[in-house]
Amino acid sequence: MDPNCSCAAAGDSCTCANSCTCKACKCTSCKKSCCSCCPPGCAKCAQGCICKGASDKCSCCA
């Protein structure tokens, strides 16, 4: 688990780096998407989006 993106429980404050790539990020302070397939600069991306295959597309950046 990424120590920079993990929290004991949802809503806990913690440090999330801009390169947050964990798949189950619960950090409310993490403004970046944790979806690795989202392209940089996608304003619609949010935590918990679902990647579609190995492409750069995901459920919130179609």
UniProtKB/Swiss-Prot annotation:
A divalent metal cation 1 binds at residues 5, 7, 22, 25. A divalent metal cation 4 binds at residues 34-35, 45, 49. InterPro entries: Metalthion_dom_sf, Metalthion_dom_sf_vert, Metalthion_vert, Metalthion_vert_metal_BS. A divalent metal cation 6 binds at residues 38, 42, 45, 61. The modification Phosphoserine is found at residue 59. A divalent metal cation 7 binds at residues 51, 58, 60-61. Transmembrane segments: none annotated. A divalent metal cation 3 binds at residues 16, 20, 25, 30. One of its GO terms (cellular component) is nucleus. Pfam families: Metallothio. A divalent metal cation 5 binds at residues 35, 37-38, 51. It comes from the Eukaryota. Residues 1-30 are annotated as: Beta. Keywords: Acetylation, Cadmium, Copper, Metal-binding, Metal-thiolate cluster, Phosphoprotein, Zinc. A divalent metal cation 2 binds at residues 7, 14, 16, 27. The modification N-acetylmethionine is found at residue 1. Residues 31-62 are annotated as: Alpha. Metallothioneins have a high content of cysteine residues that bind various heavy metals; these proteins are transcriptionally regulated by both heavy metals and glucocorticoids. Class I metallothioneins contain 2 metal-binding domains: four divalent ions are chelated within cluster A of the alpha domain and are coordinated via cysteinyl thiolate bridges to 11 cysteine ligands. Cluster B, the corresponding region within the beta domain, can ligate three divalent ions to 9 cysteines. Monomer. This is Metallothionein-2A. It comes from Oryctolagus cuniculus.
